[in-house]
Amino acid sequence: MVMKLFDSELNIMEILWRDGDTAAKKIAEITKEKIGWSKTTTYTIIKRCLDKGAIERQEPNFVCRALVTREQVQEHETAELINKMYDGAPDRLIASLLGQKRLSAEEINRLKRLIESLE
């Protein structure tokens, strides 16, 4: 089961998904540069991810490893959105998304292929 991850936790996960196993010290450097977080803030968020089972800590050097994939989190978040905002109806989500903008021919073809693959 994939757990609910908050935006701050997703910032940590994005680093791990992009870079693979990463030392907590390096994660703190990245978040300081990109987000402006202090080292303490970063370590607090890393601890939350550890407590939730989203990452594991490896020694030496406090190396963090993602235990859930980006795809698992995306699927979980999408299911939550569909249930919360669209009464569990994925077609209502798709209709809402499609109503937001005009699709290119390439986007329409990709959607057609996706639908055909589900049939």
Question: How would you name each of these model-derived features?
Answer:
Residues A79-E119:
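Amphipathic alpha-helical dimerization/coiled-coil segments
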Residues R57, A66, A105:
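Short beta-strand "wing" residues that participate in macromolecule-binding interfaces
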Residues L5-S8, P60-T78:
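Short, cationic-aromatic polyanion-contact patches
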Residues G53:
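Glycine-centered, phosphate/nucleic-acid-interacting loop/turn motifs that mediate DNA/RNA or nucleotide
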Residues L16-G20:
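Short helix-to-turn junction characteristic of helix-turn-helix DNA-binding domains
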